[in-house]
Amino acid sequence: MQYKQAGLPRWRGFNLLGMFTTRNEGWFPEEDFQLISELGFDFVRLPLSYRFWTKGGDLDSIEPVYQVNEKALESIDACVRAGEKYGLHININFHRAPGYCINPGEKEPFDLWKDEEAVKAFAWHWDLFAKRYKDIPSSRLSFDLVNEPLARTSSRARSTSGRSPQQCAPSAR
């Protein structure tokens, strides 16, 4: 009996965590993507922290959120290109976004669900990614706007309106 899945594709692959923190360079050798493909997998998820591609600075201010480190973005580009080269679907996932972090105890200066400044910064970053990757088809690249938005019960992390991801969805399409 042949099984054909309806709807969304069923991906099999790996999380590559090197861009989830600012403590490492976030670089993955192309050979990693080649090996993932040769082993029969077809998916790589990149859990990202926006702090990886911003220049840092005072977390009590929104200004550093808009200061982009182009070299860090180029390392994300390299992952997307390697995915294309080896037939891997790449998923870009914001684990940490302006005003939101899934990790307990991680300080964010604003609340994505309550502060308009955080919503604007969140949308600005997704617009940056949407423009950067606009020519790559959704069969090769997808976006997960915010990781597990309702997973934590903390009022600082829990969405009450769902408005923020909805505001960014048009950019990511």
Where in the sequence are the language-model features?
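N-terminal carbohydrate-binding accessory modules
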Residues: M1-R45, D58-D60
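Short, well-ordered coil/turn segments that N-cap beta-strands
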Residues: G7-R12, G40-D42, E84-I90, D135-L141, ...
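Hydrophobic faces of well-ordered beta-strands that scaffold small-molecule active sites
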Residues: R12-N15, V44-L46, I76, I90-I92, ...
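Active-site beta-loop-alpha junctions enriched in small/polar residues
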Residues: L16-M19, S49-R51, H95-A97, V146-E148
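Acidic-and-aromatic substrate-binding clefts and catalytic sites of carbohydrate-active enzymes
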Residues: F20-F28, F52-T54, N69-E70, K120, ...
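Surface-exposed, active-site-proximal loop segments in enzymatic domains
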Residues: F52-A72, P98-E117
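Substrate-binding cleft of carbohydrate-active enzyme catalytic domains
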Residues: I76-R96
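Active-site region of glycoside hydrolase catalytic domains
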Residues: P104, W113-R173
